[in-house]
């Protein structure tokens, strides 16, 4: 059994911070569950280009408001209770509205190791 708290993960190397977001990676590849689980905060008033070419992701909004724009497609509002699934490695822009940082629960498959960072194309590489 694995038991962790958000606070203990937040105060460890499992917390990754960037200009637009921070992610607390509570479950990673080395936990051998076949997926990873993160609590990610998207900072208010930001836009982040993301294209997970090597991973599928499902995201549940717990708080805040924003939108996701699929490149070449539609834009969808995000608010608490919204689930979106990037089941086709969708290239997208994620925006958190001003005064509305978003807190999201995220699941990745394959799981990430925790060492990944977005490259210039918004991609996480596959890392062993």
From Swiss-Prot:
Catalysed reaction equations from the record: (2S)-4-acetamido-2-aminobutanoate = L-ectoine + H2O
Gene Ontology biological process terms in this record: ectoine biosynthetic process
UniProt KW keywords: Lyase
Pathway membership: Amine and polyamine biosynthesis; ectoine biosynthesis; L-ectoine from L-aspartate 4-semialdehyde: step 3/3
Pfam families named among the record's database cross-references: Ectoine_synth
Highest taxon above the source species: Bacteria
Gene3D superfamilies noted in UniProt: Jelly Rolls
EC number: 4.2.1.108
Molecular-function GO term, any one: ectoine synthase activity
Free-text function comment from the UniProt entry: Catalyzes the circularization of gamma-N-acetyl-alpha,gamma-diaminobutyric acid (ADABA) to ectoine (1,4,5,6-tetrahydro-2-methyl-4-pyrimidine carboxylic acid), which is an excellent osmoprotectant.
PANTHER family: L-ECTOINE SYNTHASE, PTHR39289
Family to which this protein belongs: Belongs to the ectoine synthase family.
Protein name: L-ectoine synthase
Species this chain originates from: Vibrio campbellii (strain ATCC BAA-1116)
Gene: ectC
């Amino acid at each position: 059994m694995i038991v962790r708290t958000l606070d203990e993960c937040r105060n460890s190397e499992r917390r990754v911070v960037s200009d637009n977001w921070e992610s607390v990676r509570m479950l990673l590849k080395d936990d051998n569950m076949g997926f990873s689980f993160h609590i990610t905060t998207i900072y208010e008033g930001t836009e982040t280009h993301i294209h997970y070419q090597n991973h599928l992701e499902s995201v549940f909004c717990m708080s805040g408001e924003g939108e996701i724009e699929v490149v070449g497609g539609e834009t969808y509002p995000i608010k608490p209770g919204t689930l979106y699934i990037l089941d086709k490695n969708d290239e997208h822009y994620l925006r958190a509205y001003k005064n509305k940082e978003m807190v999201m629960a995220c699941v990745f498959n394959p799981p990430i190791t925790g060492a990944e960072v977005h490259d210039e194309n918004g991609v996480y590489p596959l890392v062993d």
